[in-house]
Amino acid sequence: MLCLPVFIILLLLASPAAPNPLQTRIQSNLIRAGPEDANIKTDKRVISGLLASILVPLIDAIIG
């Protein structure tokens, strides 16, 4: 009789402790990947587009 509650408690404690294999594989791949693999390099077009969207309205407001 006492075996069943102990088994259920152990089962509940063990199930969240088991790692998700997909998640651990993705994490290990991200750790091993360098910035060039993840394509983190800044693109000049992105920066120029951001500057243009900020500076053009600012200059228009100053001029008139």
Swiss-Prot record:
Top-level taxonomic group: Eukaryota
Subcellular location: Secreted
Propeptide: 20-43
Entry keyword Transport: no
Cleavable signal peptide: 1-19
GO cellular component term of the entry, any: extracellular region
Organs and tissues of expression: Expressed by the venom duct.
Keyword annotations of the record: Amidation, Cleavage on pair of basic residues, Neurotoxin, Secreted, Signal, Toxin
Extra remark beyond the main annotation: The mature peptide does not contain cysteine residues.
Name by which UniProt lists this protein: Conotoxin VnMLCL-033
Species name: Conus ventricosus (Mediterranean cone)
